[in-house]
């Protein structure tokens, strides 16, 4: 049963006419017994047999046997009238396990959205078309949102989640579609499908919300920003809407609903510095369903509707960076000034009193004779061996020069000339030598004298023992002394 285009039987005929001629080819037709047009018969062109097939599915439970009457004639009518040949065909229907059938195949149920979990919705069952009693079990094949549950024995459908009519992902035109299965315990088991269509009725479960939720406004002569109000619910749970500012947002902002009640104008009523602020806007619909929405408002330093915001990074971060850069630059300038000033003020390499060039020495002579000053005789004999103290300087880069080798003072007086020339060359390359271009060498008078010859004057206890005539040879600067002492005896 339930098989379409199934070959039931082949009918064979005998014809003495020439094979494959029109007088030989047979034509078959069913003349009785097929009230439901379940069968059809055609001719095999090769064997000239009649092929009986089903063109509809046979139902064992409706009819177990079909008796058909088949007639056969030639394509070419007989020349003389002859009786036609007929055959009786009995078709027995074989019973097979048929799937359960839901009644009706598609079931429409109206139910209110938002019902509680576990609340019953409907019972959706199927019948078994077979004559034998078989047990049928039920389960859900496709439930996109997972909102339903089905009892496997009774087929009772209950709510397993919150049914939301406004869920556009799963609900189309207020209808939520679910597919269920019914399976029997036959051999082999068969399954039937059914469709459950839930028409969700609206309740006031959504509050109104404004769009957009981000605005930009000037803090000088601000232009009100219009926000459209939307509500997913159906009338009468929609407009007119009401607006109210909460969380102290009404201190700086105002919210007014238009005449139609489907939009709200948000405006700044007090000056605010540039920045981002949260405005708490509460909207309620005609059914007093309230919804709080936080509007993100960007306030700019501008006028009217010329909304332009400078990048806050420029002033919030650039100014401190510039200040730090200027402070660093000022510090560098101060350090540079101190370094240059330190370079200009240098300590003299020799104290002024140490410079004995072109100076007249006063020996404190008061008439009775000169008082010898205390000199370090050992320094006069050391000559070039008396090396000056090294002066540290920070205005020039250090250079590495090998220390010159000075020749020791010879014992032979005849070698004193070579001694001076060689040590002069060494002193010219000595970085520790005094910064003078001449070598100071005192006249050496021999080792027998305890005092070097500082002058030709000899010590005496009286002015009469001294001769001052040599002062006339010293020039005009000593003329007065020459007059005072040179001619004193004649007076």
Curated annotation (Swiss-Prot):
Residue spans, topological domain Extracellular: 1-316
Protein name from the UniProt record: Cadherin-3
Subunit details: Interacts with CDCP1 and CTNNB1.
SUPFAM superfamilies: Cadherin-like
Top-level taxon: Eukaryota
Topological type in the membrane: Single-pass type I membrane protein
The entry's keywords: Calcium, Cell adhesion, Cell membrane, Glycoprotein, Membrane, Metal-binding, Repeat, Transmembrane, Transmembrane helix
Transmembrane segments: 317-339
Limits of the Cadherin domain: 1-102, 103-208, 209-314
UniProt xrefs under Gene3D superfamilies: Cadherins, TCF3-CBD (Catenin binding domain)
Keyword Transmembrane: yes
PROSITE patterns linked to this entry: CADHERIN_1, CADHERIN_2
GO biological processes: adherens junction organization; calcium-dependent cell-cell adhesion via plasma membrane cell adhesion molecules; cell migration; cell morphogenesis; cell-cell adhesion mediated by cadherin; cell-cell junction assembly; homophilic cell adhesion via plasma membrane adhesion molecules
Free-text note on domains in this protein's UniProt record: Three calcium ions are usually bound at the interface of each cadherin domain and rigidify the connections, imparting a strong curvature to the full-length ectodomain.
Organism: Bos taurus (Bovine)
């Amino acid at each position: 049963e339930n098989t379409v285009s199934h070959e039931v039987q082949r009918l064979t005929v005998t014809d003495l006419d020439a094979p494959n001629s029109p007088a030989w080819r047979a034509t078959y037709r069913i003349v009785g017994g097929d009230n439901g047009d379940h069968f059809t018969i055609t001719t095999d062109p090769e064997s000239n047999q009649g092929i009986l097939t089903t063109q509809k599915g046979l139902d064992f439970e409706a009819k177990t046997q079909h008796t058909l009457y088949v007639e056969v004639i030639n394509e070419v009518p007989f020349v003389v009238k002859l009786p036609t040949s007929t055959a009786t065909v009995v078709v027995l229907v074989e019973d097979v396990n048929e799937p359960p059938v839901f009644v009706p195949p598609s079931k429409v149920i109206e139910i209110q959205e938002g019902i509680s979990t576990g609340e019953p919705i409907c019972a959706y069952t199927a019948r078994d078309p077979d004559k034998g009693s078989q047990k049928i079990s039920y389960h859900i094949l496709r439930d996109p949102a997972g909102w339903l549950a089905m009892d496997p024995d009774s087929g009772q459908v209950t709510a397993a989640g919150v049914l939301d009519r406004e869920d556009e992902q799963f609900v189309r035109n207020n209808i939520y579609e679910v597919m269920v299965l019914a399976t029997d315990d036959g051999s082999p088991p068969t399954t039937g499908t059914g469709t459950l269509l839930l028409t969700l009725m609206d309740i006031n479960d959504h509050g109104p919300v404004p769009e957009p939720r981000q605005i930009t406004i000037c803090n000088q002569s601000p232009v009100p920003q219009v926000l459209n109000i939307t509500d997913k619910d159906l009338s009468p749970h929609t407009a007119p809407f009401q607006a109210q500012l909460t969380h102290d947002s009404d201190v700086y902002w105002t919210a007014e609903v238009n005449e139609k009640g489907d939009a709200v104008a948000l405006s700044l009523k007090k000056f605010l510095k540039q920045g981002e602020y949260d405005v708490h806007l509460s909207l309620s619909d005609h059914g007093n369903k309230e919804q709080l929405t936080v509007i993100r408002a960007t306030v700019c330093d501008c006028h009217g509707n010329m909304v332009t915001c400078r990048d806050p990074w420029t002033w919030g971060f650039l100014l401190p960076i510039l200040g730090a850069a200027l402070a660093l630059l000022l510090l560098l300038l101060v350090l540079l000034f101190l370094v240059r000033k330190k370079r200009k003020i240098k300590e003299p390499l020799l104290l002024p009193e140490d410079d004995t060039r072109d100076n007249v020495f006063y020996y404190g002579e008061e008439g009775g004779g000169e008082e010898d000053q205390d000199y370090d005789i050992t320094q006069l004999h050391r000559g070039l061996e008396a090396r000056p103290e090294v002066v540290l300087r920070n205005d020039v880069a250090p250079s590495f020069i090998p220390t010159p080798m000075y020749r020791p003072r010879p014992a032979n007086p005849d070698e004193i000339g070579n001694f001076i020339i060689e040590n002069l060359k060494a002193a010219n390359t000595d970085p520790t030598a005094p910064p003078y271009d001449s070598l100071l060498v005192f006249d050496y008078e021999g080792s027998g004298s305890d005092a070097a010859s500082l002058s030709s004057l000899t010590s005496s206890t009286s002015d009469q023992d001294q001769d001052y005539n040599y002062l006339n040879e010293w020039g005009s600067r000593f003329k007065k002394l020459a007059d005072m002492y040179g001619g004193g005896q004649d007076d």
